[in-house]
Amino acid sequence: RGGFGGLRQGLDATKMVGLNLNYEKKNLIQLDGSVRWNHSDGNLATKVASENFVSSSGSFANRLSQNYSRTNSWDARFRMEWTPDSMWNIMFRPSISLKKTDGRTISSSAAFNEDPYEYVDNPLDDASIEQLAQEDRVVNKQKTTTISYGDATTANGMIQVNRKLSGNGRNVTLRVDGNYSDEDSKTFSTQDLQYFQLMDMLGQDSTYQAYRYNLMPTKNWGYAVKAVYSEPIANKTYLQFSYQYKYSFSKSDRSTYDFSRLNNGVFDNITPAYRSWESYLACLTEPLADY
């Protein structure tokens, strides 16, 4: 396998803003907190020209893809430790994060039975494809697009209460942990493939298309309760009894809608944009549930 060369050019811009909080009143309370916002934009272009050698003949392929992405996220954390007196210690630690991600990709490719650069400057240009097809030098061409979106919310919390029962280390601790997450992802993808040297039953170029819309909401939550009793039995030696109960719940409801029975190229006039689901769904000839 040989290659004429490839080009990858990408840009990635990031931003971050943060805030920290610290407060302490000795022997009574400690507070720590932070908030972070992060944003990123990505842009990656890939251009590839290659040749595959099989015996004395070769096949040539060109591919051009453009990928865009962006992410916004918030993260907040807090910690409180309170000691109202020498016998009690209470700790509380919550956190929450929010994240949204977007992506869109456009890719074009074509396969040739001769080196296309001997006849045209830009093999993936529509006019070039048409010219090379008339000269029987194009094997197939393909166009794919994808838009994706993700939305995730996550929250966690812990509260712990410790009570000293004596001055020699006897104590009891109760701890409760909880977690919750809600995620939602969507993807709409199109693939249009045309074979120039494979005819259908009507004597026309054979085509293939795959159009899919995927939805995947997921929810998870759970909690845990733990109780611990410590009894000193010797110098720096303790006997500990503990009990823990955990519960968790998870639900994922994935849906896939297949629009491949629509005509080839039905979405050609749509330019992929972030969260542009409605532009695609407006082209449907039947209700979404029928797919």
Q: Where would I find each of the regions flagged by the language model?
A:
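Primarily recognizes Gram-negative and organellar outer-membrane beta-barrels
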Residues: R1-Y291
